[in-house]
A protein has these predicted regions:
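Hydrophobic membrane-insertion alpha-helices, especially the h-region
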Residues: 1-8
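Ser/Thr/Pro/Gly-rich low-complexity linker/stalk segments immediately outside membranes or between
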Residues: 12-26
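Local sequence-structure signature of Cys/Sec-based thiol-disulfide redox active-site neighborhoods
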Residues: 23-51
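Short active-site oxyanion
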Residues: 29-31, 53-55, 85-88
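Stable alpha-helical elements in mature extracytoplasmic
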Residues: 37, 44, 59-62, 94-98
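Short alpha-helix boundary/capping motifs
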Residues: 37-39, 57, 72
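Conserved helix-turn-beta segment immediately C-terminal to the redox Cys motif
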Residues: 45-65
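Thiol/selenol-based redox catalytic cores and closely related redox-interacting motifs
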Residues: 69-157
Length: 157
């Protein structure tokens, strides 16, 4: 009986979803929340999947309820939200910032990219005339449960 319990625990542990990046960082499954009509949200999810993360894509009627549930400050809200381990991810946060978050494990609630900056993952814009990308610099903001914010990363084209 003890052995069968051990076997069940090992089977459950082996089924836990996580990804290993090139840097060998253990990354838990991402649980994403978005509206059905959001195309840029799908592109952000593909950005994560293309970088080896497992993403559960939840279509929800009321994305604002998720933002309230995870205490995302109003001024940082964007079109989609996600949970990765104990952290909340809001908006078009790039994989590099997510990896940094999981490496450093700061005492924060999560990261956000306010608005929808051109060139952030999912917000790439291609010019038909020049076939080049139109990117802008943006900041990845860390936030705490109390609503305190600080710059976590600066992203430049």
């Amino acid at each position: 009986l003890i052995f069968s319990g051990f076997l069940i625990v090992n089977i459950l542990n082996s089924q836990e979803s996580s990804a290993k990046t090139q840097e060998n960082i253990d990354i838990p499954k991402v649980v994403s929340y978005r509206s059905a009509s959001c195309g840029c949200c799908k592109k952000w999810i593909n950005h994560l999947r293309d970088n080896g993360l497992e993403v559960v894509d939840n279509i929800v009627e009321d994305v604002s309820a998720i933002k309230i549930q995870y205490q995302i400050p109003n001024n940082l809200r964007s079109c989609h939200s996600a949970q990765i381990g104990k952290y909340t991810i809001e908006g078009h946060v790039p994989i590099e910032s997510i990896k940094k978050l999981l490496e450093e494990k700061p005492l924060i609630s999560g990261l956000a990219v306010p608005g929808m900056p051109h060139g952030s993952p999912g917000m790439e814009i291609h010019s038909h005339e020049s076939h080049s990308h139109d990117y802008e610099s943006y900041e990845v903001v860390a936030f705490s449960e109390s609503g305190k914010t600080q710059i976590f990363d600066k992203i430049s084209p």
